[in-house]
């Protein structure tokens, strides 16, 4: 019996998980998404061609991989169908859990309307309806992908839901679709998606029993976890390794190696605490060189220095076996590079994450920069200062680096 390896982001998302998964996919039979929705975005570069994936696992770019969208994901049929249209021959290579919850048009309308009402206190969501979809799931009023197999019945259930919540929709100025419009959409979803809908948990159990190689692909980052992130500025699902198992129906004994994906600096989209944010020239330089624009939202990411306190925290949360250090090349040409080794909090120096992270100040140490690592594929060819930087990050995080990315391209990766 084999075990499922897990790839997990350990900052605020956008760490480069897609590139790592894409690089590793050739060694796996199954690649699986476990949580989130189309608020997540993976960018993968292959031979100069850019692929942006939001719902589909990154294994879709490898013909031998079977790709699974698990029960913990909230699925927008509209978005998924559009994404599927980019690829050929998906039959037998893509499966969607019949237990995954649906993310429908009204969810995004609710999301946008509620954010608008909050004004300056808005969370800074993607507006994709992810929170409202998970809210329906927790309230036990949601609908699941398996219900698409009976579109007439699902349509009737949704119309009843809309009528029961008519006052709520009117307050948010959201127009309720007609039964005819809704049924037409559901029938279209049914026609296209039915061949892909199945019990993916049983499929994975069988795969592990048959010693197949399985990779679980995390979405977003551990600092956005609903329980362990910077609440309330978090996502609506569990983004840590334990959540990856839950979101696919696997048990803790079925977890294999856990690899944490981390940028050589730090970024964050939206509002919320971000201790190492640099609002000056260095932060702007990182943003420009790193092309730090959100894949799903098009929003500019906030940029700053490596936060070793946060990474050490998320390394423990996830039980990491190794790190994959991404976008090291973005720091090429910096004379000095900062690392946050601790925080100042209420007059004390601390090395942990308090629940009110917005009240800390970073304590930095500086290291000498380097000229260029871009495109290097051999560790021995890295500049000495880059090697020292990597060694210091390992020391502060308490986890060894196994992979180093030196450009957006798939093959520009050092494996240690």
From Swiss-Prot:
Documented EC number(s): 6.3.4.4
Binding positions for Mg(2+) per the UniProt entry: 14, 41
Annotated organism of origin: Campylobacter jejuni subsp. jejuni serotype O:23/36 (strain 81-176)
Residues forming coiled coils: none
Protein name as it appears in the record: Adenylosuccinate synthetase
Subcellular location: Cytoplasm
Protein function: Plays an important role in the de novo pathway of purine nucleotide biosynthesis. Catalyzes the first committed step in the biosynthesis of AMP from IMP.
Keyword Transmembrane: no
